[in-house]
Regions:
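N-terminal capping/small domains of soluble enzymes
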Residues: 1-95, 101
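Alpha/beta enzyme core
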Residues: 90, 102-192
């Protein structure tokens, strides 16, 4: 049975992919999951420089679920390109790299470095606080989302997926802003 799907010109052998953040780049899961069976691995967010993440405890079990505040811990794009991309290239799966940043310039620096990598698509996490806009997440104001999407689209040589924030009153307004700015796809949503 053919289970392939095509998104923004990229064909996946099946629609099963990991969610960013929960799977890292898959290195820790080799004993549990055959990465060759996945349509794609969506990596944990990567920034222009290493981020230490939040201090522990980062996860708490509560009645009816769990709370988490990881803080986008990541090794930075340079380590990621040397370690994670080569690891993922050993598998028959597409690579979608989740990109995070604190300023538009941070995002653009990561996107530029990923342009010549083996990544198939880029997922742009706009739930990150925008330090130039009073720490309001890029994805919480339609004009900020339009701006960052259009700037990334102009820089990227790979299809971009805008990963929207759940912390908005009307997510359709945000999706329309990303689409109008040239996003190739929309991903819903970051942690709530």
């Amino acid at each position: 049975m053919n289970t392939s799907v095509t998104i923004a010109g990229v064909t996946f052998k099946n629609p099963v992919m990991t969610a960013s953040g929960t799977f890292g780049s898959g290195m820790e899961y080799g004993d549990f999951v055959d990465l060759n069976r996945l349509g794609a691995v969506v990596t944990k967010g990567v920034a222009n420089v290493p981020w230490p993440g939040n201090p522990t405890p980062r996860v708490a079990e509560v009645y009816g679920g769990m709370l988490n505040a990881i803080g986008l811990q990541n090794p930075g794009i340079d380590v990621f390109l040397k370690r994670d991309i080569p690891f993922l290239q050993h598998y028959d799966t597409k690579i979608i790299v989740n990109v995070c940043g604190k300023t538009v310039e941070d995002y653009l620096e990561v996107v530029e470095k990923l342009n010549d990598s083996a990544a198939d698509m880029l997922e742009i996490n706009v739930s990150c606080p925008n330090v130039k806009e009073g720490a309001i997440a890029f994805g919480q104001k339609a004009d900020c989302l339009f701006d960052i999407t259009s700037k990334i689209k102009n820089e990227a040589r790979k299809p971009i997926i805008m990963k929207l924030s759940p912390n908005v009153t009307d997510i359709t307004e945000m999706a329309k802003a990303a689409e109008a700015a040239g996003a190739d796809a929309i991903s819903l949503i970051n942690t709530i």
